[in-house]
Amino acid sequence: APRLPQCQGDDQEKCLCNKDECPPGQCRFPRGDADPYCE
């Protein structure tokens, strides 16, 4: 699967992230080994 780009600023597209890089409630943590992403 293609890797998602890293979060940058207020980018609203799906991207790799941590809870400090996304608006509250917008960071998704998929099951398994998938990386979290903004949504």
UniProtKB/Swiss-Prot annotation:
GO terms for biological process: cell adhesion. Residues 27-38 are annotated as: High affinity binding domain. One of its GO terms (molecular function) is enzyme inhibitor activity. Keywords: Cell adhesion, Secreted. GO terms for cellular component: extracellular region. Disulfide bonds: none annotated. This is Decorsin. Inhibits fibrinogen interaction with platelet receptors expressed on glycoprotein IIb-IIIa complex. May prevent blood from clotting during either feeding and/or storage of ingested blood. Belongs to the ornatin family. It is found in: Secreted. The keyword Secreted applies.
